[in-house]
């Protein structure tokens, strides 16, 4: 586990050059925030105390899709129970809900989404700082694995966003989008992004001084995406709309090589590894706390 003492993690950045390894220091003097994105926070709940030296922010996805769509995701009501426990432990300002991705099928209609969103919003009222919505992009891999999915058209996106904003106001949950149609701002959504300077300052209570040279990963994205220490082809949820996993066989092979004692997510050190230090620095303004 991670404690107040510095730890190191290693990541093979390029599958075509697997000998290239990046070393990250997991230490409070260079890591301002640990950001988690998950559909199931429960396995981490008993170990949160090990992260007490770090600021945290959690995005937890809760959608209405059943096991045919998300076969490895726990029952949604269990997930919501974990979100409430997480919020109670670290504070609602450090927890956000993702309703993502939004798509249409014969089962999951516009009306279905409206009813489901309200049920979840009712459960999470007072437990989260905001909700991020996003609409499914039909990548070729997604079309192949999930042929019945339909993208949400522009007018339906605007209708759903307006309704989600209305429901969100009712339950005290602002709606945000990230890299979606900028016109959704007219529907009442905050389109500035999900992991922005403002969001992280509110969560941590500290001013962040971001270098001007810091660039977004995608055009139109203002999120502070730092060092991603996760990997593709390691998630066992098996969601049919996923574009990050190649196939079940690759995931199973990777999981087989996971060693909890290793500083790599998958595998360990190999002969010939070329280890490069990640460029890391704190952006916290030590002189200024916001509140």
Descriptions of predicted regions:
Residues 147-208, 256-258:
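Flexible, acidic/Gly-rich N-terminal and inter-domain linker regions that tether
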Residues 248, 252-291:
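Short Fe-S-cluster ligation motifs
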Residues 21-22, 26, 31-40:
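Non-catalytic, usually N-terminal nucleic-acid engagement modules in DNA/RNA processing proteins
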Residues 41-43, 58-72, 99-106, 138-141:
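Conserved radical SAM core fold
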Residues 227-246:
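Local cysteine-cluster metal-coordination motifs and their immediate loop/turn environment
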Residues 1-6, 10:
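Single conserved hydrophobic/aromatic residue that forms the stacking wall/gate
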Residues 27, 188-232, 255, 274-286:
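N-terminal [4Fe-4S]-dependent radical SAM core
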Residues 78-144, 162-179:
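Conserved C-terminal portion of the radical SAM core fold
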